[in-house]
Amino acid sequence: MPRRSNFLLIILVICAMVPLSWAVVSGPATELTSASGSAAATQSEIENQSEELQNATVYPRDVLTYHYNIFRQGQTMLEKVLTPSNVNSSTFGKVKFFATDGKVDAQPLFANQLAVPSGVQNTLFVVTEHDSIYAFNAATGAQTWKVTALLPGETPSDDHGCSQISPEIGITDTPVIDRQRGPHGAMYFVAMSKDAGGNYHQRLHALDITTGAELFGGPTEIQAKYPGTGDGSSGGFVIFDPSQYAERAGLLEWGGKIYIAFTSHCDRRPYTGWLMGYDAGTLLQTGVLNLTPNGNEGAIWMAGSGLASDGQGFIYLLTGNGVFDTTLNGNGFPINGDYGNAFVKVAIPQLTVADYFTMWDTVGESNNDDDLGSGGALVLPPFTDNNGQYHYLAVGAGKDSTIYVVDRNNMGKFNPNNDDAIYQELSGAVSGGVWAMPAYFNNTLYYGASSHALKSFSISNAKLSASPTSQTPTTFPYPGTAPVVSANGTSNGIVWAVENSNPAVLHAYDATDLFHELYNSNQAGARDQFGPGNKFITPMVVNGKVYVGTQNGVAKFGLLP
């Protein structure tokens, strides 16, 4: 039987979103997709899962992972303080700033009612590109603890002459917290560093969330090899070189394993697409998958979005421009195992490709750096069509301005002539291209493309609307925006989005009509401003507060005193 912490992740999703059986257009679903992904779960399986969920420890107001849940839906449905009527410049604004020693590229995390040496408090966790990890009292702003991921004699990595993560590279990825691990709970993240001899390191850390102490004998040096003759190969294996990579994608915990993925520095070869698994209790490597082992490129970065899962034993991710083998085997898979520029479904814990989709002109898109990998994958709840048939879907979009909706049980694979095998394709729906994560709330999908408005697409009859149902009056400069939604159930929905400008701007919109802007942080002059923008930032909303990462800390917004 799976350990209880696996079900803790599910119950956090449930508390923040939907009943156990999800929510669908026509009402609550009575079936769940089975672990095989090919059939409905039996009623007894659902009941067994329900019992496990009821027995798990519940922390309903925690934010322990990127975009609230493993589906990466970006919605919290427990918000009872912030409403469309009180989020305005007269009653809402910046109330605190948590200063840090470096850029905050990762989404902050939050543990409700955490016991620390000084008592019990709501705790905000922040990581920086200076390789520092902070725990703050979320109410007072007092620093509970601060530790470094650096070993003696080390510094954060230099930026390799690449402006994508600059001026230093430390902790870019959003961590994941498991409150059931270790004596008080564990936070997992990957940190990059450089030693006095000029050697680069990528390490997986697990910290006690009460003290900041390393757990499980960590940190673990990340090393890997995989059969292949692609970029950076030697002796029939592609070799993971820590100097060539950065870990930008948010970490995923599922089934007692931590999953991490890597991208390049400014597409500078040699590099390939790495996905790795580690045991959450020992930090020992449990699996490695390379998605371009006999080719090149095809890395995983997704603008900092978290690796997504359906909770049924599969990861969903998008790869960047790279080699895709257009010659397929009898089952429709690339003969050399190269999946550049693709929407990929990976079976866990074994880390094998279970299915995929890529567009008919994938080679041309990769050659033009017009790939899918700049956006994140989002797993949608089950929907029923007008015939009562269930559909299990995931969605992704990248630089080609198209929203791709895949059937998770039959993603579509590759057809050299057309994309007819995909479930739904909305060409040109996100003009400008996507360098961000979407959000889902109440049968609506929200996408913020680069240099365009944030748009909403409704879902009906298990299909996305062909055109936006609303859009913001605001145009979001590169890289667009990664929204989140706060609500009390399905009421009082607010869409939050950060504009990457100077100064950066936090926006709030009515979730039912994006043209109705409720608030932005420029409306009160300097009072609510928080410095220049930081790309790929996504807000985090919890307990009536909104937290936004910046170039030197985290800004906190809430109702004014």
Predicted regions and their residues:
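Bacterial N-terminal signal peptides
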Residues: 10-21
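N-terminal propeptides/leader regions of secreted preproproteins
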Residues: 23-58
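Mobile, glycine-rich extracellular loop/lid and propeptide segments
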Residues: 59-383, 389-414, 435-457, 480-487, ...
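A conserved acidic, glycine/proline-rich C-terminal tail/linker
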Residues: 527-528
